[in-house]
Every structure is written in C-alpha cells, then in structure tokens.
C-alpha cells in the first residue's frame, strides 16, 4: 500500500508548478559560497563601522550647532573660505595684513595647505553635483569623514600585518577610540583631521611595498607621504620612523631587494614631492630632522653595492677586506660631510619642539612659549587610561603575539607602537599619533585570542571509547580517555574567556561613547555648565564679544590680546590683531606679554607704539571659568621676561606662590592684566555668602578692589563677564 502511494505522490507534485525553482522565486540561485559569504560579511561590517565612525563624532552638532571648535581651526576655516572665493593662485600668494600687525604674514609660505585644499575640493565637488552647501558645513564635517576613511585604512593595514580578523577589529577599535576622537569630532577642523588618515595610509602603503617589493606600492607610499607633508608638520615622525625601521632591518640581517625598492622609491619621490610645499622647501635636505633619512638612504646604496660585490667575488677573505675598507670609508666620509654641513650652516639644527621631544625639560627651560601650550605638556597616566581604556592592557598582549610571529610587517608596527607611545608620554598631543598603533596591536591581540579560543570549541569530542584493552594498548587507551575527559573543561574555559573578552569590548564601547559625548564634544568657544537644579546653562560670551567687535569698531581697528585668541578675533571679529596662534615671532609675543605685566603707564607706551585701539582679556572670576588670562598670566611674564629682562617672575610671586588676594605682590596688584580683569569686580557679589569681589575661579577675595583706569576705558563686557574689551584712549594734549 505504501508502494502505491509514492508514485501517486510524485505524480501529483509533478503536476503542480514548483514556485521555489522558478527564476523569480529561486533561492538556490541566491545561495553564496563560503568565500562569498565571508566577503559579504566583511563588507557589511566595514560599512557599519564606517557609518559608526561618522555618527559617533556628531554629538557636538546635535548638542550645540554646526560650528568650528577650538582656536586654530578658525584660521583654517578663514583660509579655506579665502581659497574657495579667490582661487588657489590668490591663496598661494596671499599676504595677510590683518594678523601680526604691523608685520603681517605671508600665508602661502607659512602653512600646510593640505587641509584647506582637501576641504575646498570636497566643496567644489559637492557644488558640481548640485549640492549647494556652505563651506563652513564642509569644514565642520571634514574630520568625521576622514575618520571614517581611516577605519578602512586600519582594516587593510591590520589585514596586511596579521589577518582579516585583526583588520576588522582594528577598524572597530579606531572608529570609537577616544584618543582619535579627541581631534576628529565634528567641528575640529584642524590639520590632524586629515593628517592621521594620511599617516596611517603612508605606513600601510610602505609596509605593503616592503612585503611585495612592488614598485607601484612604493610609489603610492611616496604620494601618501606627500599628502601627509602637505597636511601636518607631524610628517617628521614618518621621515624618522621609516629610516629607523630600515636601519633595524639592515642590522638584523633582513636586507632584501623588496626593502631596497620600497625605501628608495618612497624616499626619492617623497622628498621631491615634499619640497614642492613652500613651508617645507629645502628643509627636507637641509634641516637636522631630515638628515637621518638621507643617511639611511646612502647606507642602503652601500649595502646594495656590497651585496653586488659579494656576488661577483668568490674569495671570502678578499670580500671581508673590501668590506672593512668600504665601511670605514663610508663612516669617515659621512662624518666629515655632517661636520662640514653643520659648521657651514648648510644643515640647520633641530628645532625647539624636536628637542623638547627628546628632552621633556628643554622647552620649559629654554622656550617657554612652547611649554605654555597645554597640549605640549607631559601626559598623565590618567590620560592614557581615559583615552585608551582596555587597549592599555591589550597592547602588551599584542606585542607578545607580534614577537611570536616576527615578520618585516610586525617589526614595523612594534617600532611604530613603542616610539609613538614614548612621544605620547612626553607630549599629550601625540597621544593622537600613537592611537592607530595601539589600536592595530590591540586588534592583533583580540583577533589571535578569539581565534585560539574558537579553535578549542571546534574540536570534535570523541563519543566512543575502547572498553577493554590488553598489553601495550592499555596505556594508549587510557591517554585517550584522559584527553577526552579534559575536552569539556577546555571548552567551558574557552566559552568563559570568550564571554570575558566580549564583555571587556562592550565596556570599551560604553566608555568610548561616554568620553566622546561628555569630554570631547564641547566646543571651547561656547561653554556649558549645569545649574543648581540640573538645568543646562550656555555661556556664549566669546561669540558675543567678537560680534560686538565686528559691529562697533572701525574696520581698521587693532586689537591686542594674548595670542590664544588671535585666530578667533580675526576670523569672527574681522579685525586686525597684534599676535595670534601662529607664534612665529617670539619677540612680538613677548612685547604683548610685557605690556600685560607692566604698570598701566608703561603698558600705554607699548600699546601706542603698536597702534593698539582695543585690548581684549578673558576673565573667569564670575563664572568660575579657570582657563582665563589670570591663570595664564605667569606664562605672559615668563615669555616677556625671556626677551625683556626688566620683567622678572619673582616680582609677581609671594614666597614662590602666585596670588591675587590681599597677600599678592604690589607688582601683581597694579599690573595691567590685573586691572583689566578686576575692574569694577570689587563691587560685584558673585556667590551667596561671599564678600563682594570674590573670585570663583580661584576661590579667593581679590586684593585690590579700588581699581582706577587712566589710559583705558571699558568699552564692552559680555553678559557673563568672560570677555572684557577696553578702548585705548588717545594721548592727551600736551603744551
């Protein structure tokens, strides 16, 4: 009966149309092979990571508005706006008379144009595609866009260093790492916005060239280096790390034609391209920071020559003699060349910032203007934990795996990681440079660990075991039983460790999101605080003051302030400034520092010599804003005293302590900066239960409440007293 039913069933099925096998409903045709599934999964993950890296940097736009952050980005925005309106030729030959009065500044020869040109190209492309956006919006979103591009480079770099898994993990880690997000949020329109992408791209292309020996990859790395040179002065790190890496490979006996092709092409073409940047020019072959790369380049030619001679000679003793003579001659010639070049002035000495990286105390002792910048300070341990979280612990594990599988590529990433972490410890700003290396090495640790643990889960558990064995076979059977019994424990341990790994990664994601939202997405030009009832208070005093300058002062008015605010005054106030954030002329900045730290009569003479019309100071005594000019005042004294010996720091201290209360020094209580900040402040009650004139930023009652101004008059004070502007009176008539 069953035999008859089967044919009937088959016939009935044959008469019905098979919808699943038709061309429209065929799912079999959609079935992908294993490699295709992996490719689709990789592309999907990278797409999600790309989007994640972009949207994670938009907190500031959502919380505030689309605006430029910090100080330097305002100069970059102003120059980009000029480029898009006037064209590249005018931009390249632009003399800016609104900065560094009366000296002015040649813009084209004193900046790295890569960021501006990149944003302008994006803007012109969008306009060509009929997306009519303002250049400011392009500038605001340039950093998130290139951060997303950096995740793709991190993926390919990790894949080249280790495997596909390491590349994917590296892309995820760097997408949300606070160490990178700190300088790539929306509105952070600074050189690092594109420079970190260029840095990682150059390293990836160079390692690819070393691994393959391909001339095309070597040339690509040279163009990547050119883009890095055009974008940021941190290119010096590349031109010193790559030769150091090549030198290590030569010393360890890893010389190869692949290395020869990669380095020579990258150095020669990269050098020629870099010299086209006016700000770099012949420094690439004359400054001390670049001499190491040239020395390694010449050493490579000696290695190649010796390798060729060794191939031609059959006599080992003769080659050893020739080797000693050649090496000795090369060392002597190189030493003489360096000595003559240095003595003649052809080779310029290292810059102060380069010295400060090798000796952290150098800037404080010799160049206080470098030490005065907060991002040039040494890094605290808490900053590493804040910016890296669990990557601090994954980094050593990644180094272990790299040393375990040592290749030309892993040697490079180890050197990159160790050197960049050292420099990050010397200067907090360079945490940004170390972040890609930390993420890549940590990704290797995560990928290798997960791969080892999942391999334990894939092991097949034996079901049958031999019950009885005799003779020599009994010991073999017992060992099998022991192994089989240990497998469940290994699998349980692997599962527990995997859960722990993913838990730590989830905590890393939560930490990164919190840091991004709370610490790195607040523009310094608009301040925010929480009120007594938890309500959000916005202090928009900076833009209020700059708007007042733009609307209420003459177009040719000269504004004197500390150099921190120069770029913002020029970009938003559209007025001429005495000094700004370029800090190229230490004497000019010292003159402003001398004026701020002098008595009013002496300061007035200095201001008249500079044709100053208005003086702007930042004061946080009312709101508790600690980054004001009073807290920066000692740097003004140090920088001014470095050029003008009449300014002495001990005159402003009491027993080595900086004070603004009644115990402050007479010079401090009567200097121009003190007067301008605390003028009329003695009449103001800032906090309940505190006397009038209580400074909330320093937590003391000021020492001089009866301040009278003779040569200046108050022109404008913002609603929260954060920015105060004073008009310089014309000289009185004299008989």
From Swiss-Prot:
Binding residues annotated for Mn(2+), in chain numbering: 72, 190, 192
Motif DK motif: where in chain: 629-636
Glycosylation sites: 574, 581, 585
Membrane spanning stretches: 39-59, 143-161, 164-181, 193-212, 215-229, 235-251, 257-282, 291-310, 327-347, 381-403, 410-426, 431-452, 495-515
Taxonomy, superkingdom: Eukaryota
Tissue-by-tissue expression: Expressed preferentially in the root but also in the shoot.
Record membrane topology: Multi-pass membrane protein
Placement of sequence motif WWDYG motif: 562-566
Lumenal side: 60-142, 182-192, 230-234, 283-290, 348-380, 427-430, 516-735
Binding site for dolichyl diphosphooligosaccharide: 429, 567
Top enzyme category: transferase
Sequence motif DXD motif 2, residues: 190-192
Alphabetized InterPro entries for the sequence: Oligo_trans_STT3, STT3_N
EC number(s) recorded for this UniProt protein: 2.4.99.18
Major subcellular site: endoplasmic reticulum
Reactions it catalyzes: a di-trans,poly-cis-dolichyl diphosphooligosaccharide + L-asparaginyl-[protein] = N(4)-(oligosaccharide-(1->4)-N-acetyl-beta-D-glucosaminyl-(1->4)-N-acetyl-beta-D-glucosaminyl)-L-asparaginyl-[protein] + a di-trans,poly-cis-dolichyl diphosphate + H(+)
Inactivation phenotype: No visible phenotype.
Gene Ontology MF terms in the entry: dolichyl-diphosphooligosaccharide-protein glycotransferase activity; metal ion binding
Family according to the record: Belongs to the STT3 family.
Record comment regarding domains: Despite low primary sequence conservation between eukaryotic catalytic subunits and bacterial and archaeal single subunit OSTs (ssOST), structural comparison revealed several common motifs at spatially equivalent positions, like the DXD motif 1 on the external loop 1 and the DXD motif 2 on the external loop 2 involved in binding of the metal ion cofactor and the carboxamide group of the acceptor asparagine, the conserved Glu residue of the TIXE/SVSE motif on the external loop 5 involved in catalysis, as well as the WWDYG and the DK/MI motifs in the globular domain that define the binding pocket for the +2 Ser/Thr of the acceptor sequon.
Record's function text: Catalytic subunit of the oligosaccharyl transferase (OST) complex that catalyzes the initial transfer of a defined glycan (Glc(3)Man(9)GlcNAc(2) in eukaryotes) from the lipid carrier dolichol-pyrophosphate to an asparagine residue within an Asn-X-Ser/Thr consensus motif in nascent polypeptide chains, the first step in protein N-glycosylation. N-glycosylation occurs cotranslationally and the complex associates with the Sec61 complex at the channel-forming translocon complex that mediates protein translocation across the endoplasmic reticulum (ER).
Subunit structure comment from the entry: Component of the oligosaccharyltransferase (OST) complex.
Protein name as it appears in the record: Dolichyl-diphosphooligosaccharide--protein glycosyltransferase subunit STT3B
Gene: STT3B
């Amino acid at each position: 009966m069953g035999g008859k039913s089967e044919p009937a069933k088959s016939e009935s099925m044959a008469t019905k149309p098979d919808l699943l096998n038709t061309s429209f409903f065929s799912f079999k045709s959609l079935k992908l092979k294993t490699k295709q599934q992996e490719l689709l999964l990789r592309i999907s993950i990278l797409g999600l990571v790309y989007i994640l890296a972009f949207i994670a940097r938009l907190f500031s736009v959502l919380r505030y508005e689309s605006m430029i952050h910090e100080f330097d980005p305002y100069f970059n925005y102003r120059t980009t706006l000029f480029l898009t309106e006037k064209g590249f030729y005018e931009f390249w030959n632009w003399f800016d008379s609104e900065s560094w009065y009366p000296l002015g500044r040649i813009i084209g020869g004193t900046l790295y144009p890569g960021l501006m040109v990149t944003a302008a190209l994006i803007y012109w492309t969008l306009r060509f595609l009929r997306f009519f956006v303002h250049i400011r919006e392009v500038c605001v979103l340039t950093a998130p866009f290139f951060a997303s591009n950096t995740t793709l480079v991190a993926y390919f770099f990790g894949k080249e260093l280790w495997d596909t898994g390491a590349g994917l993990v590296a892309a995820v880690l760097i997408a949300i790492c606070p160490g990178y997000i700190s300088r790539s949020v929306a509105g952070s329109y600074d050189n690092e916005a594109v420079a970190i992408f260029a840095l990682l791209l150059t390293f990836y292309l160079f390692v690819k060239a070393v691994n393959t020996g391909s001339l095309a990859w070597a040339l690509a790395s040279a163009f990547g280096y050119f883009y890095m040179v055009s974008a940021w002065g941190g290119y010096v790190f590349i031109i010193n790390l790559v030769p150091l890496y090549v030198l290590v490979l030569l010393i360890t006996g890893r010389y190869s034609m692949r290395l020869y092709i990669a380095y020579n092409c990258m150095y020669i073409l990269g050098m020629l391209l870099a010299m086209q940047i006016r700000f770099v020019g012949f420094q690439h072959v004359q400054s001390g920071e670049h001499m190491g790369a040239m020395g390694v380049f010449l050493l490579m030619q000696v290695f190649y020559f010796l390798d060729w001679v060794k191939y031609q000679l059959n006599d080992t003793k003769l080659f050893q003699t020739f080797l000693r003579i050649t090496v000795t001659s090369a060392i002597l010639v190189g030493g003489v060349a360096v000595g003559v070049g240095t003595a003649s002035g052809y080779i310029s000495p290292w810059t102060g910032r380069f010295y400060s990286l090798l000796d952290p105390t150098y800037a404080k002792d010799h160049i206080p203007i470098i030490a005065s910048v907060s991002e040039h300070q040494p890094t605290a341990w808490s900053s590493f934990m804040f910016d890296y979280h669990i990557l601090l612990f994954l980094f050593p594990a990644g180094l272990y795996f790299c040393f375990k599988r040592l290749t030309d590529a892993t040697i490079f990433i180890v050197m990159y990681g160790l050197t960049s972490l050292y420099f990050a410890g010397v200067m907090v700003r360079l945490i940004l440079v170390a972040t890609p290396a930390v993420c890549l090495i940590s990704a290797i640790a995560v990928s290798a660990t997960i791969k080892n643990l999942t391999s334990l889960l894939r092991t097949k558990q034996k079901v049958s075991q031999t019950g009885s064995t005799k003779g020599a076979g009994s010991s073999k059977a017992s060992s099998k039983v022991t192994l089989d019994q240990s497998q469940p424990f290994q699998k349980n341990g692997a599962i527990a460790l995997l859960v722990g790994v993913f838990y730590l990664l989830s905590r890393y994601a939560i930490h990164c999101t919190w840091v991004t939202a709370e610490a790195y997405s607040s523009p310094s030009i608009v301040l925010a605080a929480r009120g007594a009832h938890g309500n959000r208070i916005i202090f928009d005093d900076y833009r209020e003051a700059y708007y007042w300058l733009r609307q209420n002062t003459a177009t040719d008015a000269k504004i004197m302030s500390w150099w921190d605010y120069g770029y913002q005054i020029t970009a938003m106030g559209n007025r001429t400034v005495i000094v700004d954030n370029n800090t190229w002329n230490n004497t000019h900045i010292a003159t402003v520092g001398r004026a701020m730290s002098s008595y009013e009569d002496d300061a007035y003479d200095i201001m008249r010599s500079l044709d100053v019309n208005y003086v702007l100071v930042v004061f946080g005594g009312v709101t508790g804003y600690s980054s004001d000019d009073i807290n920066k005042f000692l740097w003004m004294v140090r920088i001014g005293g470095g050029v003008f010996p009449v300014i002495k720091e001990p005159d402003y201290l009491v027993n080595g302590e900086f004070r603004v209360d009644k115990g402050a020094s007479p010079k401090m209580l009567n200097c121009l900066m003190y007067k301008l900040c605390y003028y009329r402040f003695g009449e103001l009650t800032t906090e309940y239960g505190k006397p009038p004139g209580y400074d909330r930023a320093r937590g003391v009652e000021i020492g001089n409440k009866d301040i009278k101004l003779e040569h200046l008059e108050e022109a404008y004070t913002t609603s929260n007293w954060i920015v105060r502007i004073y008009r310089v009176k014309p000289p009185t008539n004299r008989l």
